[in-house]
Curated annotation (Swiss-Prot):
This is Bestrophin homolog 22. It comes from Caenorhabditis elegans. Residues 417-455, 474-499 are annotated as: Disordered. Residues 417-432 have a biased composition (Basic and acidic residues). One of its GO terms (cellular component) is plasma membrane. It holds the Pfam family Bestrophin. It is a multi-pass membrane protein. The gene is best-22. The lineage of its organism: Eukaryota, Metazoa, Ecdysozoa, Nematoda, Chromadorea. Keywords: Cell membrane, Chloride, Chloride channel, Ion channel, Ion transport, Membrane, Transmembrane, Transmembrane helix, Transport.
Length: 499
């Protein structure tokens, strides 16, 4: 099950930090707590034996072991270096596996758009194309994911679930391919597309090739999943990492003991090695990241939702091909006509507007936005000049005679540029974003009474906003989107117009 915590980290504050930290499922606490408890118990057991059961001479020998094991331990086993490379490699591999699990939306949209026809035969073809792709995905995933294998333990369960018919299962059983049969349903899909083109349901070979390419892209993703399952990370690599981390903390069981006797005792005797326990939490948790991501198709908390992907692809794909299509002559192909009907084409709300101002709620409008504007675009380098002189570079001037040099000399008047720049800067200072928003808030605060259908005092807000703007728009060529004008109760409209 994939653990979602995105909403918890939507803001960088202490509340988000604690919301993230206090989770249990999929957390570092769940992954490490049991091993940390065992390690701490063994550490305390060794400490008790050292303190109370060993003779003074044995304690001297044990203290020599403590110094020996703790000497240059971090340098001899560089866990940060080892884990950094390994986890980066595993995360990149995990991302490729995630991208290989295909969504059927693109292919379904092409089926619905390019395979024309509202008759039952065409509808069956479009739906079967979706089903064949989902069947291919299920066949692949049930061989590489325990989630899907438990859901479909036999081929009969695939037929019982509706992903294939018993006739199709018989065909699969009689295919003489000792390696795989994943390609079979893909081949059925390609054959159906070709038959549709021959029957005129697909208008051209170009459109047929577009559909074929999309099916091929879906198949390529499934093939990449099989390759990642077939060729895992070389066994030596995870063995070295996992063994190094555990050996490190086995050595720490002795090397991090507090020396309580002898000429050089530890400066402080805490019994529990707090810093080493923090190291255990960090390094072991870091290693658990790699362990969880080595096979993201398993059954851990953070593994991918393979069964959900199959369900989503089947339901969404069938919905797309069977509801979002319209025939030119005979009407709509689905009972849910309102879903298949293309909306009437009307002018959008921003028609004829020079300055478009998309709307925000008052709360979200307070958030500053960093626009895509060059960092040097607002700098005026000719502020105190009337003109600038343009000339070739000195390296080129040396190649020209004096008469040719004069022909390249240009004088550029920058007075208009400076005037426009000064005007723009003045407008920005007079109409700062915070000041304008504050004015809008003071005008509208406590004045709205909005009904459930989006109207205010029984009047549609959109219509009233357009009515208020009419007089302003006719006198100002640089129109502002009418919806950006505040809507006020009738008693304030006259006052508002003066602003």
């Amino acid at each position: 099950m994939t653990i979602s915590y995105t909403l918890d980290v939507s803001q960088t504050n202490l509340q988000s930090f604690f919301s993230l930290l206090l989770r249990w499922r999929g957390s570092v606490w769940k992954a490490v707590f049991g091993q940390l408890a065992v390690w701490t118990a063994v550490f305390l057991l060794i400490s008790c034996i050292y303190r109370y059961m060993l003779s003074p001479s044995q304690q001297d020998v044990f203290e020599q072991l403590i110094r020996y094991f703790d000497n240059k331990l971090d340098a001899n086993i560089p866990l940060t270096f080892l884990l950094g490379f390994f986890v980066s490699f595993v995360v990149a591999r995990w991302g490729s596996i995630l991208n290989g699990i295909g969504w059927i939306d693109d292919a379904s949209l092409l089926f619905a758009t390019y395979i024309r026809g509202a008759d039952e035969e065409t509808r069956v073809i479009r739906r079967n194309l979706v089903r064949y792709l989902v069947l291919s995905q299920a066949l692949v995933l049930r061989d590489i994911s325990m989630q899907v294998r438990k859901r479909f333990p036999t081929m009969d369960t695939l037929a019982a679930s509706g992903l294939m018919t018993h006739e199709e299962m018989d065909i699969l059983d009689h295919i003489k391919d000792p390696y795989s049969r994943y390609w079979t349903s893909i081949q059925w899909s390609l054959n159906l597309v070709y038959e549709c083109q021959k029957k005129g349901k697909v208008d051209s070979y170009y459109l047929m090739n577009k559909i074929v390419d999309e099916i091929g892209k879906f198949r390529h993703g499934l093939a990449s999943l099989l390759k990642y399952d077939w060729v895992p990370v070389p066994l030596v690599y995870p063995q070295v990492i996992f063994l190094a981390v555990r050996i490190y903390f086995m050595i720490c069981l002795i090397g991090r003991q507090f020396i309580v006797t002898g000429p050089n005792p530890s400066g402080i005797d805490l019994w529990l090695p707090i810093t080493t326990m923090v190291q255990f939490l960090v390094y072991m948790g870091w290693m658990k990241v790699a362990e969880a991501l080595l096979n993201p198709l398993g059954e851990d908390d953070d593994d991918l939702e393979c069964n959900y992907i199959i369900d989503k692809n089947l339901i969404t794909g069938l919905s797309i091909v069977d509801t979002m299509w319209k025939h030119d002559d005979t009407g709509y192909s689905m009972v849910e006509e309102h879903m298949a009907k293309t909306p009437a084409q009307k002018k959008d709300e921003f028609w004829g507007i020079d300055k478009i101002a998309p709307l925000y709620s008052m709360e979200s409008a307070e958030r500053s936005v960093h626009p895509l504007v060059g960092s040097a675009s607002k700098i005026n380098l000719v502020k105190n000049k009337k003109e600038i002189v343009m000339t070739p570079h000195k390296n080129k001037l040396s190649e020209l005679d004096p008469s040719e040099q004069k022909t390249y000399l240009r004088r550029v008047n920058v007075s208009d540029h400076n005037a426009k720049h000064a005007k723009q800067r003045g407008l920005e200072r007079a109409n700062s974003p915070d000041k304008c928003l504050s004015k809008m808030r003071s005008r509208s605060n406590g004045k709205f009474r909005t009904s459930a259908n989006g109207s205010q005092n029984g009047v549609d807000l959109w219509t009233r906003a357009g009515d208020i703007e009419m007089n302003v728009a006719t006198s100002n060529p640089n129109q502002v989107h009418p919806h950006s004008i505040a809507v006020f109760p009738p008693e304030e409209q006259q006052t508002t117009s003066r602003h």
